[in-house]
Amino acid sequence: MKEIESFLVYSSSILPECILIFSSIGILSIDLLSLPNEGDTFWSYSISLAALAISIIILLLQWNKEPVLTFSETFQISRFNDIFRFFLLICSFLCIPLSVDYIRCTKMPVTEFLLFVLTATLGGMFLCGANDLISIFVASECLALSSYLLSGYTKRDVRSNEAMMKYLLMGGASSSILVYGFSLPYGLSGGEIQLRGMVNGLINMQMYNSAGVSIAMIFILVGIGFKLSLVPFHQWTPDVYEGSPTPVVAFFSVTSKVAALALATRLFHILFSSLSNEWHLPLEILAILSMILGNLIAVTQTSMKRMLAYSSISQIGYILIGIIAGDSDNGYASMITYMLIYIFMNLGTFACITSFGLRTGTDNIRDYAGLYRKDPILTLSLVLCLLSLGGIPPLAGFFGKLYLFWCGWKAGLYFLVSIALFTSVISIYYYSRIIKLLFTERNKRITIYMQDYKGSPYFLIPNNSIGITMILCTIASTVPGILINPIIAIAQNTLF
């Protein structure tokens, strides 16, 4: 009976991940057993979306379960880990409808795309709950390799191939640095691989305050800095964003950030909890550099995707305020709250530029001039998402930033919050510049695609899958502003 009970506990702990594994096998089987002209894409999309929806429901049903360590203490179930797993599932669930029309227009294979998306989601979910160094590395590489393949998904596009190579080379280098950082506390602790066991081993060996642990912390910070696109580890981000397919950029612009934030928070909270003074300063410097350079360089961009790349760099700088503030001042709760809102703001913006790009074939910001005349619904959605990203009241982004900055201020991060407020004003400038272009200027060098542009209906009924994602994300970027208190209460319930 004890073995059966243990099996049920273990299997239920990774049941959402198991559903994604079985759905991936099902999608691959459909592709292998069906003829090319049978039109199996409907079933592939349906299986993937159903698997993600079921996984979300299971996670919600498991919300009140007690924290538990399973699989020889290599995987941890807790509310904090579950909220990040939930974020990853939401991202994937919204990104798949975003890609349907894009894949149909570019005539790219569906099965490979869905497999890479589900595999990346699977790796990110395992990374959120991984409790030992081996599981952390394997899960992070599963997420990273799937992201590399997604960035080079359009093989016939030279820019996509270039983006994949840059992402692969930089990602491989960062993974090597991260593994080297893991190797130092592993050796100094006497061969421990579990996170808390490693801390106990370092204390017992009287090596916790040694130079080796400080060096390991620096290497781990560099490795995570790449995954979060923090300045100065951000060089790959604009090129990869510009060269990769837009739905792919939408996907890993949020999933990689969510998984890396979960990993960073757990490492700093568990492994380096007594060294907060040592890692606070470098993390503050990275946050300041990311906020300043990300927003300043975004002002000069002419490509919408490159602008969003630098915008995402600055947004992560804001989110780091929550990690630095820590648990005592609701820093983690503010980070979770803003991350949830950021997912919808970012995906909503990418849904708008995906729809515009498919209809016009351009990504240049100046080609958006006068869009409101052709497509008022797309214009309204883009305006609301950009204003929410800038933190304009009463949209959700304003309340998310307000809570994040307030928690940072209470934690004594006065200079960091002041920089965040100043750079937020800069971000409002380049967001409002795009909004002004949408309403006031006309594009004289209009393309043939823009001449035949068919706008969405004037009523809020989307006529394609991109429109569904766009409307949902726009609503989620707006409505939570008046429902921020319940969201904050849920976030405060997810702490360690």
Curated annotation (Swiss-Prot):
Where does it reside?
A: Plastid, Chloroplast thylakoid membrane
Is Transport among the key words of this record?
Answer: yes
Q: Cite a GO CC annotation.
A: chloroplast thylakoid membrane
Cysteines joined through disulfide linkages: none
Q: GO annotations under biological process? A: ATP synthesis coupled electron transport; photosynthesis, light reaction
Top-level class of the enzyme under EC nomenclature: translocase
- Keywords for this entry? Chloroplast, Membrane, NAD, NADP, Plastid, Plastoquinone, Quinone, Thylakoid, Translocase, Transmembrane, Transmembrane helix, Transport
Any GO MF annotation of the entry: NADH dehydrogenase (ubiquinone) activity
Q: Does the keyword Protein transport apply?
A: no
Instruction: Spell out the subunit comment.
Output: NDH is composed of at least 16 different subunits, 5 of which are encoded in the nucleus.
List, alphabetically, the HAMAP family matched. Answer: NDH1_NuoN_1 (MF_00445)
Could you say which protein family the record assigns here?
Answer: Belongs to the complex I subunit 2 family.
Protein name in the entry = NAD(P)H-quinone oxidoreductase subunit 2 A, chloroplastic
Q: Which gene encodes it?
A: ndhB1
